[in-house]
C-alpha cells in the first residue's frame, strides 16, 4: 500500500454556552486513520481544556472507525457529560462516512 494512513476531519456546530465557541464557532474532530483497517491512530479536537482533549482521545484511539462506531458513540454519551457530546458524535459520524466513501473510491489504488 502506497499510503498507510490519512487524516480525516468532521465538523459540528457548538452550543453557544461553551467557552470554546468564543474562539471556534464549531467543533473540529480530526482522526488519523490506518487506511487498510480503519483503526484510529491519533486524534485532535478543538476543545479548550487539555482534559477534554485527553478524554476525546481516550474514546477513539485504538478503535475502528467503522466496526467500533456504535460503541464509541455510546461511550461518548455516557462519559462525556458536557454539551459537546452530541457535536463530537456528529463529527465522528462525518468521519466514518468520509472514510467509507474514500475506501470505496480508492481501495483499488491503495493495494500497491
Residues covered by each model-derived region:
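Active-site- and interface-proximal helix/loop "cap" or "latch" segments in soluble metabolic
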Residues: 18-30, 35-112
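Short Pro/Gly-enriched beta-strand edge/turn motifs at strand-loop
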Residues: 10-18
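Short, compositionally biased leader-like segments
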Residues: 1-11
Amino acid at each position: 500500500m502506497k499510503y498507510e494512513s490519512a487524516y480525516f476531519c468532521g465538523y459540528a456546530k457548538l452550543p453557544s454556552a461553551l467557552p470554546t465557541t468564543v474562539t471556534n464557532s464549531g467543533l473540529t474532530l480530526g482522526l488519523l486513520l490506518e487506511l487498510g483497517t480503519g483503526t484510529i491512530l491519533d486524534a485532535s479536537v478543538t476543545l479548550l481544556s487539555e482534559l477534554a482533549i485527553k478524554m476525546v482521545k481516550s474514546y477513539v484511539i485504538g478503535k475502528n472507525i467503522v466496526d467500533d462506531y456504535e460503541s464509541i458513540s455510546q461511550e461518548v454519551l455516557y462519559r462525556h457529560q458536557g454539551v459537546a457530546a452530541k457535536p463530537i458524535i456528529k463529527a465522528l459520524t462525518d468521519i466514518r462516512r468520509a472514510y467509507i466513501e474514500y475506501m470505496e473510491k480508492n481501495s483499488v489504488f491503495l493495494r500497491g
